[in-house]
Amino acid sequence: MPKLRSATSTEGRNMAGARALWRATGVKDNDFGKPIIAIANSFTQFVPGHVHLKDMGSLVASAIEEAGGIAKEFNTIAVDDGIAMGHGGMLYSLPSRELIADSVEYMVNAHCADALVCISNCDKITPGMLMAALRLNIPVVFVSGGPMEAGKTKLSDKLIKLDLVDAMVAGADSNVSDEDSAKIERSACPTCGSCSGMFTANSMNCLTEALGLSLPGNGSMLATHADRRELFLEAGRRVMVLAKRYYHQDDESALPRNIANFKAFENAMTLDIAMGGSSNTVLHLLAAAQEADVDFTMADIDRMSRLVPHLCKVAPSTPKYHMEDVHRAGGVMGILGELDRAGLLHTDVFHVAADEGGNLKSVLAKYDVMQTQDEKVKHFFMAGPAGIPTTKAFSQDCRWPSLDNDRQEGCIRSREFAFSQEGGLAVLSGNVAENGCIVKTAGVDESNLTFVGSARVYESQDDAVAGILGGEVVAGDVVVIRYEGPKGGPGMQEMLYPTSYLKSRGLGKACALITDGRFSGGTSGLSIGHVSPEAAAGGTIALIENGDRIEIDIPKRSIKLAISDAELNARREAMLARGPMAWKPIGRERYVSLALKAYAMLATSADKGAVRDRSKLED
């Protein structure tokens, strides 16, 4: 029987000092011997997805203590990618993922916690906590802050739904009046919560459901809705169930590495492809798999992308649906149910929502709205928006008049009526990206599935933005932004501003963009990121020159620089001849702090999840 980890600091006379300190935090005589459950919160007033999380730790703690545990809360940092975007702040976003993972590990191991509840929400916080949870391998439950309500406003007497991307595009579009731009800006992000489309934050919170580490509704229940309160309470109760199963019954199925195994990672990626999730999820799943010692690679993602249909289309891929609409259609469990009926899901995997002895199949039987007989579950998925601006959680209790069970023309489709039989993400490879790159096909217009154009090369995102807004980029160009990978940036910046500005100049369907950086979950269009190897690691993207012909063929999963092998080799030799300046951007001026330099020294390319190069840390 496993011994409580916390016994290390609570048992024996030699731990009298540690017990004295525990007592100073409120622990009583009869508490010693109970499991200590760490609550990793990520409250901050900088981020709308986290601004309402201040009291959530106390809510989870109340359920833990009622179930017989000791709850101790700590906080992590949280970077808002939207606020950090478009300037040097974005260099810190991806590196913050590793910092969050390390900080959770530090706190949990330093204090010998027995189990963990992760309160996350936005872009790098959920992945960072996920990496930590799989690294620690103690019982864990994830519960997120929930999505923001979609914005709504009237333009030309027509009511439209909005999100963050609409504000960015309108702000850069000279054809939009100052009045309309301001109106969109004020309406785009009306409430607390993670941005309202299928962007990175919501994608990752959905994937924790598919991995088996969070409760049904975690990815789709609105941050403002009163029903979300129960998710926090149940997370506290459920982590105690898992802790007792492991420490009292020696049941290792309660551990995250046995829940999030290879099959679960396949389920998560299947969901991601089916719902057209953010391309960043590929990066984060690859990183999490390494922490879990699961051999899940780009090759698996490529294989699955050819098999899984696109069953759920959400903003930014369409203005019609946002996360509140996904929830009304049954949320993640609704999509997983359709994937199961299509024979594309492993249902024999463990899940934190399953009763002892149960698995994902039993969870779907209860929570898939197309098969459940539970009226409470149906009521749960009818939770809707109030349309009232607020920063407060649980502030409203509005309901849709009915569920969206239309699997032919609704938000979630059956395989027969899929938005497309090709999934929402694809892995491309070729001499531009020998180790692969990612495109969110859900956001690509059918006319652009094949594209041939001339390279317009930029050594940084800043130069690309200036070039796009300055009229350098014209229809038919392939914008190449390099030296923005994990090592070369450093930090692998998101390229939402370049893609948004292409749209604002009417070039969204007339140009392609490729980069060793990454894209916001809000990106759509022919935007190809995660090019691996990156330029700073000797990738071919560093050898592309202005005017080169680049051929993109998504159906054939290829991306090619159309020059001879002899010419490519000559360019490589010329690059190597630059000596210490080889594989570095020419003429770029950028301040890189010591913290970012330390990150860059260990960073791998995107095909490895941009995690640390462990070979550099081995004895």
Curated annotation (Swiss-Prot):
InterPro entries: Dihydro-acid_dehy_C, DihydroxyA_deHydtase, DiOHA_6PGluconate_deHydtase_CS, ILV_EDD_C, ILV_EDD_N, IlvD/EDD_N. Pathway: Amino-acid biosynthesis; L-isoleucine biosynthesis; L-isoleucine from 2-oxobutanoate: step 3/4; Amino-acid biosynthesis; L-valine biosynthesis; L-valine from pyruvate: step 3/4. Its cofactor is [2Fe-2S] cluster; Mg(2+). One of its GO terms (molecular function) is dihydroxy-acid dehydratase activity. One of its GO terms (cellular component) is cytosol. Mg(2+) binds at residues 81, 123-124, 494. The active site is at 520 (proton acceptor). Binds 1 [2Fe-2S] cluster per subunit. This cluster acts as a Lewis acid cofactor. It catalyses: (2R)-2,3-dihydroxy-3-methylbutanoate = 3-methyl-2-oxobutanoate + H2O; (2R,3R)-2,3-dihydroxy-3-methylpentanoate = (S)-3-methyl-2-oxopentanoate + H2O. [2Fe-2S] cluster binds at residues 122, 195. The modification N6-carboxylysine is found at residue 124. Its EC number is 4.2.1.9. Keywords: 2Fe-2S, Amino-acid biosynthesis, Branched-chain amino acid biosynthesis, Iron, Iron-sulfur, Lyase, Magnesium, Metal-binding. The keyword Iron applies. GO terms for biological process: isoleucine biosynthetic process; L-valine biosynthetic process. Functions in the biosynthesis of branched-chain amino acids. Catalyzes the dehydration of (2R,3R)-2,3-dihydroxy-3-methylpentanoate (2,3-dihydroxy-3-methylvalerate) into 2-oxo-3-methylpentanoate (2-oxo-3-methylvalerate) and of (2R)-2,3-dihydroxy-3-methylbutanoate (2,3-dihydroxyisovalerate) into 2-oxo-3-methylbutanoate (2-oxoisovalerate), the penultimate precursor to L-isoleucine and L-valine, respectively. Homodimer. Belongs to the IlvD/Edd family. This is Dihydroxy-acid dehydratase.
